[in-house]
């Protein structure tokens, strides 16, 4: 299973990636929105772990782009945002 971890906090990103790699997953990482979109549009992932608070293009923008180009890829949102509106927007 191929995963992409998108998180701007390098320590968090690397810790999540290492745990998943150690569990046997193939893992790519990136730390900003533009780089993430480039990976998403050129590679095939089974799951994307996506932070919402990213520099440049934020996670919601990436999610909208992903849904326009590939409805099949599953996304797990990883964020400190706690607002209900953010959760609902992520489901759309």
PLM feature segments, named:
Residues 1-92:
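N-terminal/domain-start alpha-helical segments
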């Amino acid at each position: 299973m191929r995963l992409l971890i998108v998180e701007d906090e390098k320590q968090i990103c690397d810790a999540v990636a290492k745990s998943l790699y150690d569990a046997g997953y193939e893992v790519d990482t990136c730390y900003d929105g533009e780089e993430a979109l480039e990976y998403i549009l050129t590679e095939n992932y089974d799951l994307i772990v996506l932070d919402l608070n990213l520099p440049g293009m934020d996670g919601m923008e990436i999610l909208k782009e992903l849904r326009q180009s590939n409805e099949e890829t599953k996304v797990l949102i990883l964020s400190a945002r706690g607002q209900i509106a953010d959760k609902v927007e992520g489901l759309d």
